């Protein structure tokens, strides 16, 4: 059955990986990605996967209603992720933003989706951050104890979903770790430690690294969202989505195993609590299986970051960009990894309209050296495919797929 699937926050850390998973079946379903940001390379990739991208905010209820009213599934990932981790980092303005986006945005979606729509929502393990003593294997029915604005907002979101009468799945995520080529987060402990380890740095272990952490691999999180979408028999449930329960010191020792050059330094700095862990028994009973582990993810992150070029401090150097401009002029670089079998020039007058012929097998790439054009694409094999419109500016590369 063809489904209409909405992914809010689809350009984020988890959303990017979820879109990759859906890329293999996007020709069979209508998939719409909504995000309040516009990141051109990611948007272009989403459109190449035959997904529709909408730049919009979940606080815009009319926009949400227009796209979600007839949805079969909503993966509701949108929200503020730059959040305070201690009371000293909090501010009234930022706390209000977290509350408004999290609560009003979620309610907007709940108000407009139908009763047949399944909404899958990421909560967080930090809804238990107020627990003072070390507690292991916390189950889903344990009463939450939020403290800061982020966890309080997530706990309220859980109540919104449970009281909505809609078909919901709540996944309480552990700290999500893992390398992403598109949307990397280095504010998560395993990712931060791996980044430092890749540069032969020093890992500081507050309170001797005794704090317990509940962790979960990024790609397994995306897999679990898709798993819950596909399982029609799983409805109105909460699951703890965690895999690894480890101490901070154990994570640092894995980093040192993969790079013996790093230094581990234990300190007596205070920490809010010694941590807690969540039980994933209920989730595993559904048949979901984890495919990734902490050791292999840390190894991958260290290796990928270690292989990055380090800038030489000889003179002003700027690398890693396709286009560079300053008062001296413009430099653009575009890597073409495939063989080129035809090369030519297009020169058009301002204000004219031209129809480009299609290539049944080959991909056409056009580098614009001057001016600006508006392109409209459609897949001619699939008459119901969406029309894609994009603006191409000077120095940008236009890619025309086969049969388009």
Task: Write out the residue ranges for each language-model feature.
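Glycine- and acidic-residue-biased ligand/ion/polar-headgroup-sensing regions
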Residues: 361-381
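C-terminal substrate-binding subdomain of Rossmann-fold SDR/epimerase-dehydratase oxidoreductases
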Residues: 201, 206-322
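Conserved metal-binding segment of the jelly-roll/cupin
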Residues: 392-404
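NAD(P)H-binding glycine-rich loop region in Rossmannoid oxidoreductase-like domains
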Residues: 58-101
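A short, N-terminal "cap"/entry segment at the start of jelly-roll beta-barrel domains
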Residues: 310-342, 353-355
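N-terminal Rossmann NAD(P)H-binding glycine-rich loop of SDR-like oxidoreductase domains
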Residues: 5-25
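Conserved Rossmann-fold NAD(P)-dependent oxidoreductase catalytic core, especially the SDR/UDP-sugar
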Residues: 76, 104-149
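NAD(P)-dependent short-chain dehydrogenase/reductase
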Residues: 159-213, 218-222, 226-227, 255-256
């Amino acid at each position: 059955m063809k489904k209409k699937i909405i992914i809010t926050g689809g350009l984020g850390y988890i959303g990017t990986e979820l879109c990759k998973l859906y890329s293999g079946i996007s020709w069979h379903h209508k998939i719409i990605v909504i995000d309040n940001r516009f990141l051109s390379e990611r948007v272009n990739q989403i459109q190449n996967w035959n997904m529709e991208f909408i730049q919009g905010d979940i606080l815009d209820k009319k926009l949400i209603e227009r796209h979600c009213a007839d949805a079969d599934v909503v993966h509701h990932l949108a929200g503020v992720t730059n959040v305070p981790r201690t009371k000293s980092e909090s501010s009234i303005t930022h706390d209000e933003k977290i509350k408004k986006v999290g609560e009003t945005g979620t309610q907007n979606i709940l108000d407009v989706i139908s009763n047949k729509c399944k909404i899958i929502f990421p909560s967080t393990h930090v809804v238990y951050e107020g627990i003072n003593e070390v507690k292991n294997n916390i189950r889903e029915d344990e009463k939450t104890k939020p403290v800061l604005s982020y966890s309080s907002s997530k706990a309220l979101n859980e109540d919104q979903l449970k009281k909505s009468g809609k078909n919901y799945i709540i996944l309480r995520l552990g700290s999500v770790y893992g390398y992403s080529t598109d949307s990397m987060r280095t504010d998560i402990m395993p990712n931060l430690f791996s980044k430092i380890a890749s540069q032969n740095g020093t890992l500081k272990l507050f309170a001797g690294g005794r704090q317990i952490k509940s962790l979960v691999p990024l790609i397994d999180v995306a897999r679990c969202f898709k798993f819950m979408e596909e399982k029609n028999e799983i409805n109105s449930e909460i699951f703890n989505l965690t895999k690894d329960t480890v101490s901070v010191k154990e994570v640092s020792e894995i980093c040192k195993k993969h790079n013996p050059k790093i230094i581990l330094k234990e300190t007596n700095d205070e920490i809010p609590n010694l941590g807690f862990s969540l039980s994933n028994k209920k989730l595993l009973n559904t048949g979901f299986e984890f495919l990734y582990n902490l050791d292999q993810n840390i190894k991958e992150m260290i290796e990928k970051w270690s292989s990055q070029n380090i800038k030489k401090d000889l003179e002003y150097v700027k690398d890693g960009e396709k286009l560079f401009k300053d008062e001296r002029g413009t430099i653009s670089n575009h890597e073409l990894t495939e063989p080129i079998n035809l090369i030519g020039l297009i020169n058009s007058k301002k204000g004219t309209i031209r129809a480009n012929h299609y290539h049944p097998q080959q991909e056409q790439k056009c580098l614009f050296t001057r001016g600006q054009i508006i392109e409209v694409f459609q897949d001619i094999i699939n008459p119901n495919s969406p029309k894609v419109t994009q603006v191409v500016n000077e120095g940008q590369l236009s890619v025309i797929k086969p049969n388009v």
